């Protein structure tokens, strides 16, 4: 849960809300949300029991420490409890207490449109490996976008930098319009790495609107804003 959302909190404390994650409990559902202004990560988890409604903002630094302690134990059971101003995480013989971030979290519901003009279903590993290869051509600190050209039956991924260029195609299933769109490759990689499904669905409206990566049950939703780009020859 933490590993699947922590990467999209803000790197600095300029906006304290972006430096934490929203934990929203309603009945037997826990929604965890993080965002940094360029992307939103959402995980919906079904709980064993039902609880009263509650919204709290947990500091990202606390969650990062917990993630380090838990390590690769993805099935580790964590008990979470709240006081008025604090959150308590208990797992194994470890107890972590942290002060909550005060304030009201961002209202993101209006950003989560279910409308789309293009839907792509693609093998997650093929897409992730292709984008990983593209990043080898990007110098550290360079903000080169990866350009994705979606057409019937194929997704073309291009990148061009001072180091070199890449142009690869992946077989896909597509519904709707063709599309040419650019992204920060790191944002796509971060989301794809924590999705366990073999096939992933990507939803697009147009080249200026966010991409949504989500499953049918919406147990995960990743919103990623596109970037402007110059056409790659």
Where are these regions (language model features)?
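DNA polymerase processivity clamps
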Residues: 1-42, 49-101, 116-233
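Glycine-rich, pocket-lining loop/helix-strand segments that form or immediately flank
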Residues: 104
């Amino acid at each position: 849960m933490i590993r699947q959302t922590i990467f999209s909190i803000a790197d600095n404390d300029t906006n304290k809300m972006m430096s934490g994650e929203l934990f929203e409990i309603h009945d037997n559902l826990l929604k965890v949300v993080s965002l940094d202004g360029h992307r939103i990560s959402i995980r919906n988890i079904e709980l064993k029991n039902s609880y009263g409604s509650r919204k709290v903002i947990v500091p990202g630094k606390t969650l990062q420490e917990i993630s380090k302690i838990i390590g690769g134990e993805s099935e580790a059971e964590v008990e979470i409890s709240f006081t008025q101003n604090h959150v308590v995480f208990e797992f194994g013989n470890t107890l972590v207490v942290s002060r909550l971030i005060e304030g009201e979290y961002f209202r993101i519901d209006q950003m989560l449109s279910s409308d789309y003009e293009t839907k792509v279903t693609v093998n997650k590993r093929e897409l992730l490996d292709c984008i990983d290869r593209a990043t080898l051509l990007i110098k550290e600190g360079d903000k080169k976008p990866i350009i994705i050209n979606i057409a019937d039956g194929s997704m073309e991924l291009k990148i061009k930098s001072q180091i070199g260029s890449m142009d690869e195609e992946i077989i896909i299933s597509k519904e709707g319009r063709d599309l040419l769109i650019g992204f920060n490759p790191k944002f796509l990689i971060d989301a794809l790495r924590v999705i366990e499904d073999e096939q992933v669905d990507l939803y697009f409206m147009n080249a200026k609107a966010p991409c949504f990566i989500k499953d049918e049950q919406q147990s995960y939703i990743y919103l990623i804003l596109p970037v402007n780009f110059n056409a790659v020859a």
